[in-house]
UniProtKB/Swiss-Prot annotation:
Keywords from the UniProt entry: Activator, DNA-binding, Transcription, Transcription regulation
InterPro entries: LTTR, LysR_subst-bd, Tscrpt_reg_HTH_LysR, WH-like_DNA-bd_sf, WH_DNA-bd_sf
Record family assignment: Belongs to the LysR transcriptional regulatory family.
Gene3D superfamilies referenced in this protein's UniProt entry, alphabetically: Periplasmic binding protein-like II, Winged helix-like DNA-binding domain superfamily/Winged helix DNA-binding domain
Superkingdom classification of source: Bacteria
MF terms in GO: DNA binding; DNA-binding transcription factor activity
Entry-linked PANTHER family: TRANSCRIPTIONAL REGULATOR, TRANSCRIPTIONAL REGULATORY PROTEIN
Residue ranges constituting the HTH lysR-type domain according to the UniProt record: 1-58
Name this protein carries in UniProt: Mau operon transcriptional activator
Length: 283
């Protein structure tokens, strides 16, 4: 008795015919009949009878089916384990800004890694745009369209911004929070400076969550992206003003990954995270 013969029994039981069982196992119908006859000969009993054009298991066959199912499940588990052991991990380096990593990527990272057991992801955050030409990253998510470069790129989303300040506070009494000096030329900071011309920020940070905590104190004014401020819309403690500034979200990948199935699944996962940002305004 061998495992291939037992698999034939399981297939015939599932499919109800030699022909469909052969297609399921990707063998010839004559092979199915031969293996079944060999097994019936070794057991000394008939395992299937033809009833109304279907192959129905006999009583002796039904006695075999439950342990046979357990054997199939064990074989599948062993095969899966061996495949995982034999499949080498592939490391991709993904870079983006801290806020995107925390808000968009982190909540579903576990789902991605479980779905892709061969994937090892090195996630790095930086306020500076990485140099893809120097292979500082395999995949990058950045704000603003790259001017040039030897990489694939696609626009996957859009980031909108709100000015948030405590309701009823005098402008001169507000603590202003803004980005560090090197980032003051970005569109949202230009809008911010139009609201408070000539005023100097008392806090400068690229960490948007730190700025959000300061805003929550009720003593500060700052610019925050939608995903960190939309919950304040309708909060009587705050005024939330939509700013004209928009920042496009771009997904970049090294050119050699264009036709790589795993890389494509990772980049599609990234793109899907931002789909709602293109659907409409939150405020």
């Amino acid at each position: 008795m061998n495992w291939d013969d037992l698999r034939v029994v399981a297939a015939i039981n599932r499919c109800g015919s030699f022909n469909r069982a052969a297609k399921m196992l990707n063998v010839e119908e004559t092979t199915i009949a031969r293996r079944l006859a060999r097994l019936e000969g070794s057991l000394g009993c008939v395992l299937f009878q033809a009833v109304d054009g279907q192959r129905r298991p006999t009583e002796q066959c039904r006695a075999l089916l439950q342990p046979l199912v357990l054997m199939e499940q064990a074989a599948e588990a062993i095969t899966l384990q061996l495949e995982r052991q034999e499949r080498p991990l592939r490391n991709f380096r993904l870079t983006t800004i801290d806020a995107i990593a925390q808000h968009y990527l982190a909540p579903t990272l576990a789902d991605l890694l479980i779905a892709e057991p061969e994937l090892s992801l090195q996630l790095e955050t930086s306020d500076d745009n990485v140099d893809m030409a120097r292979w500082h990253a395999d995949i990058a998510i950045r704000l603003g369209r790259p001017r040039r470069g030897n990489f694939t790129m696609r626009r996957v989303g859009e980031m909108r911004f709100n000015l948030v300040l405590p309701r009823g506070a005098a402008p001169e009494d507000l603590v202003l929070a803004a980005y560090p000096d090197p980032l003051m030329e970005v569109p949202e900071m230009q809008d911010f400076q139009q609201y408070f011309p000539g005023r100097q920020a008392r806090l400068r940070s690229a960490n948007l969550r730190v700025i959000r905590v300061l805003v929550d104190s009720g003593r500060a004014a700052a610019v925050l992206p939608d995903f960190l401020s939309v919950d304040l819309v309708g909060d009587e403690r705050f005024q939330v003003h939509r700013l004209p500034a928009r920042r496009e979200i771009w997904l970049l990948a090294q050119p050699h990954l264009r036709d790589d199935p795993l890389a494509r699944r990772v980049t599609n996962w990234c793109a899907d995270l931002f789909a709602e940002t293109l659907a409409g305004d939150a405020v």
